[in-house]
């Protein structure tokens, strides 16, 4: 059985390694996806200026209600659509996905696919 501490340490090391490489490409902002025990968040960050351009979360009042929860795969799909819409309004079309060291599977894949369908390129 895998120790949770070791699993989390490996994820954090992957996240730092990936973020270092992503910060080297300053021509595109980072699309950061994060999941907590209750909610999902996403933000687009311009590392050159150190500014958050777009922020969206399942905690917002205008976020569509889901029968399962605010951290489900369907909520991740809706969050991808919301982020893509806000990015269009902010004038952002190309981003780099920062998955915070997590495996590209499940909620992250659903979020990324719906953001691509919404018009973001990465």
Swiss-Prot record:
A molecular function (GO) term: structural constituent of ribosome
Stretches that traverse the bilayer: none
Keywords carried by this UniProt record: Ribonucleoprotein, Ribosomal protein, RNA-binding, rRNA-binding
SUPFAM superfamilies according to UniProt: Translational machinery components
Gene Ontology terms: biological process: translation
One Gene Ontology term, aspect cellular component: cytosolic large ribosomal subunit
Pfam hit, one: Ribosomal_L18p
Record Gene3D superfamilies: 3.30.420.100
Subunit structure: Part of the 50S ribosomal subunit; part of the 5S rRNA/L5/L18/L25 subcomplex. Contacts the 5S and 23S rRNAs.
Family, per entry: Belongs to the universal ribosomal protein uL18 family.
HAMAP family with a match to the protein in the record: Ribosomal_uL18_B
The protein, known as: Large ribosomal subunit protein uL18
Species whose genome carries this gene: Leptospira biflexa serovar Patoc (strain Patoc 1 / ATCC 23582 / Paris)
Gene: rplR
